[in-house]
Swiss-Prot record:
The protein, known as: Ribonuclease 3
Organism: Geobacter metallireducens (strain ATCC 53774 / DSM 7210 / GS-15)
Gene3D superfamilies cross-referenced by the UniProt entry: 3.30.160.20, Ribonuclease III domain
Gene: rnc
Keyword tags: Cytoplasm, Endonuclease, Hydrolase, Magnesium, Metal-binding, mRNA processing, Nuclease, RNA-binding, rRNA processing, rRNA-binding, tRNA processing
Catalytic activity, reaction form: Endonucleolytic cleavage to 5'-phosphomonoester
Annotated EC: 3.1.26.3
Binding, Mg(2+): E59, N132, E135
Cofactors, names only: Mg(2+)
SUBUNIT field: Homodimer.
GO terms of molecular function: double-stranded RNA binding; metal ion binding; ribonuclease III activity; rRNA binding
Length: 246
């Protein structure tokens, strides 16, 4: 490998530790990570060199792994939703725009190996390229460590998004509905208090209680505070409905 290749390989190794810390997973075989970050434009500039592969095969596998895990999350969190609704939610969650945003949030663009032309044309910020790299990274983690580590990453990234689409999935925004009910009945607004934060930094789980005039009304948990608040509001509404007070 030429001098530029050695420098590029070294750069990948140096950035690997930073990237691993960000996703909460340390690779046993960093070759999987290096391949996930290698765009075909970089490979095309080094035709004839041995052992260089782009990330397109990993992208293919990552798409399947991501689809499985997001489907599993939707199936568990929206037990009353029918297949068509779940399919639409899944399509919106794993679309290019969402994946590119997640890749940008994790800073994947700056870790990429790109050819000169791709670099000059702004490839590090190109949405399609970032989305593909996100899928390739998930596949790399899967091949290196199995489904468990990938599921933790996907839960971390997608749980806040699931909370955001909860109203679209059910036709209800539980926090807003709860607030309107409380204002009508009690002339005040509910409040939420965070009572527990569990798990490592890359896999937090929040527990909150919903209160009205200082009285505890319900409790909910989620991967984000917003999701936990929605869960708490939903619990209160469900209880009121069961008691015939909805």
């Amino acid at each position: 490998m030429g001098e530029r290749g050695v420098e590029d390989k070294s750069a990948v190794q140096e950035s690997a530790t930073e990237l691993e810390a960000g996703i909460g997973y340390r690779f046993v075989n960093r070759q999987f990570l290096a391949e996930a970050l290698t765009h075909r434009s970089w490979v095309n500039e080094r035709r004839g060199e041995e052992g260089i592969r782009d990330n397109e095969r990993l992208e293919f596998l990552g798409d399947a792994v991501l689809g499985l895990l997001v489907g599993k999350m939707l199936f568990a969190r929206f037990p009353q939703s029918r297949e068509g609704v779940l399919a639409r939610m899944k399509a919106s969650l794993v679309g290019e725009e969402t994946l590119a945003a997640l890749a940008s949030a994790r800073g994947l663009g700056r870790h990429l190996l790109l050819g000169r032309g791709e670099e000059r044309s702004g490839g590090r910020e190109r949405r399609s390229l970032l989305a593909n790299t996100y899928e390739a990274l998930l596949a790399a983690v899967y091949l290196d460590g199995g489904l468990g580590p990938v599921e933790r990453i996907v839960e971390q990234d997608f749980s806040p998004l699931l909370a955001g689409i909860a109203s679209g999935a059910t036709g209800r925004d539980f926090k807003t509905e709860f607030q309107e009910m409380v204002q009508t009945r009690f002339g005040t607004a509910p409040t939420y208090e965070l009572i527990a934060t569990d798990g490592p930094p890359h896999d937090r789980r929040f527990t909150v209680i919903a209160m009205v005039a200082g009285k505890r009304m319900g409790e909910g948990a989620g991967r984000s505070k917003k999701e936990a608040e929605q869960a708490a509001a939903r619990q209160v509404l469900a209880r009121f409905a069961a008691e015939g007070e909805g």
